[in-house]
Design a protein with these regions (language model features):
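HIT superfamily nucleotide-processing domains
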Residues: 1-117
Length: 117
């Protein structure tokens, strides 16, 4: 399969468990921008099993703790883009963990809505 997420190099992986892996985004929108993905190739969040969702959640907590200690962000945006119209560019389900910092945008109210504009 020709999927960039299915072919991650071991040294790129920050954390992993039986069903998921976490790594830094190769095109970050902020310092520490990370992704958590299922090991199994599936296109979107809605294709994940309950077990995969639980594994992704478990790793998201580890990533947050790591980012808190390393980068000291002031907040986070997290979420999944689904399909091309929803902003998904790699058709392998992935959770974005985007650290936010005071002053990174003029008025952060509205969170992700501001990033998208």
């Amino acid at each position: 399969m020709d999927c960039v997420f299915c072919n991650l190099a071991k040294e790129e992986i920050l954390f992993e468990n039986d069903l998921a892996v976490a790594f830094f985004d190769s095109h970050p929108v902020s310092q520490g921008h990370s992704l958590v993905i299922p090991k199994r190739h599936c296109a979107t969040y809605f294709d994940l099993t309950k077990e995969e969702i639980a594994s992704i959640y478990e790793l998201s907590q580890k990533v947050k703790k790591y980012l808190d200690n390393k980068y000291h962000p002031d907040g986070y945006n997290i979420g999944f883009n689904v399909n091309e119209a929803g902003g998904q560019s790699v058709m392998h389900a992935h959770m974005h963990i985007i650290p936010r910092y005071k002053g990174d945008v003029e008025r952060p109210r509205g969170g992700i809505r501001k990033i998208l504009k």
